[in-house]
Structures are given as C-alpha cells and as structure tokens.
Amino acid sequence: MVQKFQSPVRVYKYPFELVMKAYERRFPKCPQMPIVLDCDVIKIESLENGAKTNTTRRCKLAVDAPYIFKKLIGVDFVYFLQHNYLDMSNRTLSIEAVNESFSSRIEIFERCRYYAHPDNAEWTCFDQTATLDIKNFFGFEHSMEKMGMKQYTQTTLKGKEIIEYFINQLEQEGVTHVDRWVPPLDAAKSPTPEQKQHHDILLDGDFIARNLGQLSPMQESKLLELRKMLDGVDDLERVPSYQTILRFLSARDWHVSQAFAMLCDSLQWRKEHRMDSLLEEYTEPAVVVEHFPGGWHHHDKDGRPIYILRLGHMDVKGLLKSLGMEGLLRLALHICEEGIQKINESAERLDKPVLNWSLLVDLEGLSMRHLWRPGIKALLYIIETVERNYPETMGRVLVVRAPRVFPIAWTIVSAFIDEHTRSKFLFYGPDCEHMKDGLAQYIDEEIVPDFLGGPCKTMIHEGGLVPKTLYKANSLEDHDDDVTIVSPGAGAATATASAEASLAPVALAPMKRLSANHQHDHQNLYKSVDLKPGFSHELLIRNEDPKSVLTWDFDVMRNDLHFTLYRVTQELPEKNDDAVSYFDLQDFVEGTNYFREEPTLICRHKESVQGSHVMHHNDSYLMHWFSPSGAQLNLFYEVLSSVNYKGSMTSLQSAFSSNSSAASSVQSR
C-alpha cells in the first residue's frame, strides 16, 4: 500500500535569495540534521546565463532504526539521489529525492519546493510531499511504514528550524540581504513574455500581528489559500475581512475546503436576509427596551467587549409571545452584529488583535419555567443560526450564580453547542466575585456589575414578566392546548401542532433547519391522561442511579389537580389497573415505607408545570396526580443520568435541594 504524506505550506519571512543562501549551508552535512552523514555533488550544470542551476547529489543517510533491525537488513546507512532545480529568475527551487538503496523493494519519492510568496515578495514559501511504497522488505513492511512516517515527521519539523538557524548565522556574519539575480547586460532578451503578476493580496507581518494575532506559518498560508478561493466566487459582492476568514477557518479546524463551503453558505444567507443592513434598519421593539435583561458593559481584561445577559430574570415565554420567533431571532442577530462592530472598534482603539467578545450570563432566578418547550426550541434554533454564521465570535462565556436547575438546562442545550465553544464556558456559584479564580481574573474589579456585588452600575433592564397586553394576537397563547399527544393504550393520536408551526418564521424560511439528529421535536413525547373524579394517576420510577435527576413537565387541560412526589423504600408490584392506587396497599404508611419528597402542589386549569428532583437514593419514586372533580393532563417526564452532573457540573451539586422548582415555575403559567 502506498503511503502519502503532505506537509502544510510553511512561510519564511525572509526573501527567497536569503533563504537560498541559508539552504546552501546545509551541505554537505550539518549537525542540525545528524541523519545526513554526507552529500557528494555528482552533477551540476548552469543554464540561461546563470539564471538556472541543476544539481544532483548522492546523499548518505544513517538508518534510524533499532539495532536488531539494522543487523537483519545488513546495513547501517542508505543512499538517496537528490535533484535540485534552481531558477533564480523566477525565484523557485524544486527538489526531488528518490532512494537508491533497496530500490527494488522500497520506492521513496519526495518533492519539495521553495518559492517566492505570491502575495509578499519579501517572504518565501515551502511545501513538501512524499510517497512511500513498500513492496517487499523481508517481512518488515509494517515496521518500515511506521519508521517512514516517523522519519518524515521529524525531518519536516526540523527543516524550518535549520533554515532559521543558518539565517541567524548569516545575520551574525553581517549578511542580511542578498541581491536578486539580474541577467548580464550583454545577455539576449528572453523571447518568453513577462508573466503578468495577478496577485494583489498583500499580507505583511505587521498586519497579521496588529489584526490577527500570532498565527503559525501553516495558518497564514491557509488564510491566504481561502482568501484566493473567495476571489473565484463570481457573485460575491465583497470579499470578507481577514478576521472573518480567520474565524471560519478556525471553526472548521483549519480545513480550507470545509471553511470555504461554510463561509459561502453564510455569505449567501447574509445576502438573502440583508444582514449587512441590519444595524442601520433594526429598531428595538418596546418590549425589548422595557423587558429584555441584556446589554453591553465595558470590556474584559483582554479588550473583548462584554455583553451581560441576566437570563434568570428573562420572561422567555413572554418575550417569545410578544416578539414571535422571527423577532427573537432578529434581536439575537442584532446583538451579534453589534458584537462584530464593537470588536473592530476595540481592536482599533487598543491597536492589538481583538477577534471576539465575552458573554456574562447571570442565572439568578433560573427555574424550570425557563425550560418552556417552545422557548427551548427557539433557543436551539437561534444557537444553530448563530454558530453557522458567526463562528468564533464568542471568546469566553462566564456563567455566574448558577442554581440547582442549571445542570438540567445545560444538559439540554449543551448538546447543540459546538464542542470548541463549550470549552469556553466557565461556571461560578453565588460567590463569583471573591472566590479564587473568580470574575476578577477576567474582569477588572472596578467594572464588576453591582448586581454581583461590584461597584459598577449597569444600564441593563431588570427584566421581569412581560404584560400579556404586549402579546401578539396570534401568539402561542392562543395555542397552549395544541400539543402533540399520545393517548395511553390507544396508539398515537396527533393533535394540531400550531404552536410548533408558529416557530418557523416566514421571513427566515430559507435558513436551514436543525439537523435531523438535533431536532427537539416534541411529537409523541407527551401522554394524555384522563383523571376521573376522586381517582389518581401514578407513575413509579425505580431508581438505580443515585443522584440522577427526575424532571417533569405537564399541562393541566381541564379542572384543577394535586401533584405530589413520594419516595418509596419497599418493593411495589407492577400495577395494571389505573383505578387501583398504591396507597390502597396494606401496611403502606407514610414515614415508614414511603416519604413525601415534594410538597403537594395545587395545579390550576390551563397551567403548565415544570419541575425537577435529584433522586439521591437507590429507591423507587412515585409521581402522584389526584383530582377531586376529575381533570385531564398532558404529561412528559424524563430521568437524566447522574453522569450529566460530573466534570464542570460538580461544583453545582452542593446547591441542590430536595425542593422542587415547580412552585417558582407556576409564576409563568
């Protein structure tokens, strides 16, 4: 099997002529490359008045292999033939090397190129490819492949170091400039027409240091490669900035083709939705001005603009019903556009690279009411849209005052956030200002917000409930009962899903929806339960995972009912008849073999109730609904594994209590 190797393009920030002067010092051998024992020039020819020089060398290389392997093959060194084709007029050097030893058993071919940087004549590029084809090598084919890969990696890494070493050596000797080759005065002019220079992208070191930060040579080259690919897009109105190109490359782990596809999709999206005009055309609706708890607040220690979002004070349901999905998305996109603008302003003001902004999320007041189903779906849709079109604009996310319900919210939402973005989240408990490695590590103490105990007042609204008078006439309020239902024992009966349909804004219809494996489609999740007067509905959950979390969400569709959560210590039988209650069992006594874990909650008609409970014990848990006058509810529950609360969630476990958050969620019903 042929093994192929491709190095990234490396950039020397020195002229081609100086790099060639340094390259010559590698021969016949140098201590920086001990594997090369010697090189003999066996042929050299000069062409076109010295403009071109072709050199063939026979190089003796040490076998970098275990002693026993060298004894088996019977050699301590091997020979390679190297052919150099130097063209000083066009400022290129092509190198081809093939193995002379064992050529009938192994074929090794390496091609390297040095050439003047196409966009900066004072720089030199280098790239390298190689193939390894082992036909038959005494039964050691696999070992040879591994050694070949290792050797290629080592020589690739050392190559640039050696050139840099000899350039520094030349500088110490006073050689910092080598004149370009010019033809002799009496030389006949070449009939070859002068090549038209069409490279107009100038990217110098000062620009990179000032605007993009420290990039590796490979990253610089890929940046230019993607920039050139964009030049070939016919219907592109304007080429994005280098900062934007850099963000998309970083988001796709520096895979140029993937970044190109992602960026082209985003540019088309921006064109379709007039995103370049959003900052000029957008006017904040009154409900945002009066009830949205978010805004910009100074800069962090790295110069990033800070956006504060007091999520725990946000009425998610009220904002969504007032703005609609399109309005909420436009608000989020406007914040992103403002962020880009403030990033550029900060970079210009500080005269240093600033490529993203920071988000400070205050979760005080967060409860299960924030996990309202349409609100979660809207949030996931916004996350997907932002990640597709504003990658790598978020530098750091500081999550403060995280309550006990936060791990549940994080479990749901984090799966939809890019892994690299998730790594930027930092979580803090209540004492986020004074704890070790607290906010002061990232934000100057004088600008810590007053609601966190700092001295700086913010201009951010407190949030609070949105008055229903601001709800849209066709908001989700009119469709609270339109949910997808599965009737127990009767198969799936699908009700109208107008609440779901209303989340697809017409103006943003061309946007790609959530991928199939990431959709939070609530179809078939909820069961419809009819409670006859004086009867109860019970669900028994046998817990074998201590510290797992039981979550529930139900809508009261007709009349009032009572809800209680119990913990049961005795083994209970399976129940086949809904008319029979576990509480009818003999010797089933509260405080002896069952315990009330959550106080009884009276749930009113048309209320939506969400709650959670950490199941600390390896017992059974009994969810109990009772209605004196008969009722109907649409019910969903889920058990979240304890593994969801390890790692970054560990510090939050101490904030858990046995009380349900359902009481606080009732406020938003």
From Swiss-Prot:
InterPro entries linked: CRAL-TRIO_dom, CRAL-TRIO_dom_sf, CRAL/TRIO_N_dom, CRAL/TRIO_N_dom_sf, GOLD_dom_sf, PRELI/MSF1_dom, SEC14/CRAL-TRIO_domain
Residue ranges constituting the PRELI/MSF1 domain according to the UniProt record: 3-175
Keywords: Mitochondrion
Cystine crosslinks: none
Entry keyword annotation includes Repeat: no
One Pfam family here: CRAL_TRIO
Cell location: Mitochondrion
GO cellular component terms, A-Z: mitochondrion
Annotated GOLD domain residues: 522-641
Domain CRAL-TRIO: 284-460
UniProt-recorded name of the protein: Protein real-time
Species this protein is from: Drosophila pseudoobscura pseudoobscura (Fruit fly)
